[in-house]
């Protein structure tokens, strides 16, 4: 407390002592007495009447009672008026009811002349009766009766005028049912066909037209029939023990669906298997391409020995076409500038030996090689890769032909590879055979327009 600031010490100061008050004076009230003297005033309990329980109406019950009373009074009034109503004795009605139409929902701005103008397009009008308000004769009640001279005009107006707009309001056209249909009651007596004042917002009709209201009523009837049919089916299922049968049926359906799913799974496995086969074939093609490159890289000595044997066969004169190929290969290694033309000529010789079975692939490969000679061995390998990827029987046929050529006398690309890789070791062969190679005739070199190369398109 000693260390507190002055403003906080004030809060701990003692309060002032309470003021002194004198003691209250003594009371002069009478003492408490018993009730014995007052028993004669109370009645005897045995002589009391039993309690009568009375029901007090609340606000909702009062409103319901008032509404029912009003409905009953209105029904009594309608029943009395309906007994006195006779449509045939009305002097203001039209003549022939079968030529008369009933028009309702007319705008209060519409006049009788406007109605005659609008309905006069269907045919000549005999009479038009626009019903007036009994309280105010200057205004009409919104409906009228129109009689045509011919019945066909009435039918045309009945079909075409329903839903027509007059003064920005759609009207409803119907036949006169008071004198045509037996036991018909008009709207003022609790009858009629309209649903605009049937009840609440969810019940009242909010659209115009006779056909639309009829279709809506038919839809409601169909919905009710569907609900009744559903209830009938549920009762039959409960009576016949449909729960267990439904369970069995559901199990059967589920098993059937599972079987179909299994079939789809089998088809999916077959599809995946086909894709796997295609991937295996693509892997084999890639391995074959690598094997060809390894063969070209590692078998240079064997190719060189084969070239030597081919040159020996040339001197003996017993190898035929392969000796010509050997001489052309040696000439190719001797003259680099003529390598592209020699390759194309050698390709044509190969096609001639094979009977031109693979004319399309060979011609494409020769044209690609002729245009890409300067790119070296890489373009040759890419051409072979593209040819391998074409797939099908043509690809397998070309692979078999290429294998036989490599086994017999080497491929064209191998000759290129040997030329670039082993050129220093074979330089003396070029010098020995250079003169003999240039002395050989080249009958196809004059055909520089590729007239001997053809394919399926005729190019």
UniProtKB/Swiss-Prot annotation:
Question: What InterPro entries does the database record attribute to this sequence?
Answer: Nucleotide-bd_a/b_plait_sf, RBD_domain_sf, RRM_dom, snRNP70_RRM, U1_U11-U12_snRNP_70-35kDa, U1snRNP70_N
Subcellular location field: Nucleus
In this chain, composition skew of type Low complexity spans: 242-254
- From the UniProt entry, list the residue stretches annotated as the region Disordered: 185-459
The molecular function terms of the Gene Ontology recorded here are: mRNA binding; RNA binding; U1 snRNA binding
Q: Which SMART domains match?
A: RRM (SM00360)
Pfam family for this entry, one: U1snRNP70_N
Which PROSITE patterns does the UniProt record give? RRM
Q: Where is the composition biased (Basic and acidic residues)?
A: 211-241, 263-408
A biological process term (GO) from this entry: regulation of RNA splicing
- Coarse class of the primary localization is nucleus
RRM domain: from which residue to which, for each copy? 99-178
Tell me the keywords, alphabetical order.
Answer: Coiled coil, mRNA processing, Nucleus, Ribonucleoprotein, RNA-binding
Q: What does this protein do?
A: Mediates the splicing of pre-mRNA by binding to the stem loop I region of U1-snRNA.
Matching PANTHER family, A to Z? U1 SMALL NUCLEAR RIBONUCLEOPROTEIN 70 KD, U1 SMALL NUCLEAR RIBONUCLEOPROTEIN 70 KDA
Q: Report the protein name in the record.
A: U1 small nuclear ribonucleoprotein 70 kDa
């Amino acid at each position: 407390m000693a260390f507190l600031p002055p403003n906080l010490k004030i809060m701990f100061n003692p309060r002032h002592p309470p003021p002194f008050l004198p003691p209250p004076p003594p009371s002069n009230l009478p003492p408490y007495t018993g009730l014995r003297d007052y028993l004669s005033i109370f009645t005897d309990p045995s002589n009391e009447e039993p309690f009568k329980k009375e029901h007090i109406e609340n606000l909702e019950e009062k409103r319901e009672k008032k509404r029912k009373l009003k409905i009953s009074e209105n029904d009594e009034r309608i029943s009395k008026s309906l007994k006195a109503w006779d449509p045939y004795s009305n002097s203001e009605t039209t003549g022939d009811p079968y030529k008369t139409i009933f028009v309702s929902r007319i705008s209060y701005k519409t006049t009788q002349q406007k109605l005659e103008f609008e309905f006069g397009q269907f045919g000549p009008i005999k009479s038009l009766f626009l019903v007036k308000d009994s309280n105010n004769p200057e205004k009409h009640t919104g409906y009228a009766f129109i009689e045509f001279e011919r019945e066909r005009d009435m039918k045309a107006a009945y079909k075409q005028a329903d839903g027509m707009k007059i003064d920005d309001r759609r009207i409803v056209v119907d036949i006169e049912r008071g004198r045509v249909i037996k036991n018909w009651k008009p709207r003022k007596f609790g009858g009629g066909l309209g649903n605009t004042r049937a009840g609440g917002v969810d019940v009242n009709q909010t659209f115009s037209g006779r056909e639309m209201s009829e279709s809506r009523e038919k839809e409601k009837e169909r919905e009710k029939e569907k609900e009744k049919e559903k209830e009938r089916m549920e009762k039959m299922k409960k009576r016949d023990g449909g729960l267990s049968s439904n369970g069995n049926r559901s199990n059967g359906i589920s098993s059937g669906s599972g079987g179909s799913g299994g079939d789809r799974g089998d088809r999916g496995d077959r599809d995946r298997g086909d894709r796997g086969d295609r991937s295996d074939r693509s892997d084999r093609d890639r391995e074959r391409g690598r094997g060809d490159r390894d063969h070209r890289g590692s078998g240079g000595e064997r190719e060189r020995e084969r070239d030597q044997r081919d040159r020996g066969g040339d001197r003996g004169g017993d190898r035929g076409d392969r000796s010509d190929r050997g001489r052309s290969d040696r000439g190719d290694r001797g003259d680099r500038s003529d390598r592209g033309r020699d390759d194309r000529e050698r390709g044509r010789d190969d096609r001639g030996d094979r009977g031109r079975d693979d004319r399309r692939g060979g011609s494409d490969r020769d044209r690609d090689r002729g245009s890409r000679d300067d790119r070296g061995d890489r373009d040759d390998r890419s051409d072979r890769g593209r040819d391998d990827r074409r797939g099908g029987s043509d690809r397998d046929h070309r692979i078999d032909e290429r294998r036989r050529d490599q086994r017999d006398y080497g491929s064209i690309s191998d000759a290129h590879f040997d030329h670039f890789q082993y050129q220093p070791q074979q330089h003396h062969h070029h010098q020995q055979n250079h003169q003999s190679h240039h002395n050989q005739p080249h009958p196809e070199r004059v055909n520089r327009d590729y007239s001997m190369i053809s394919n399926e398109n005729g190019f």
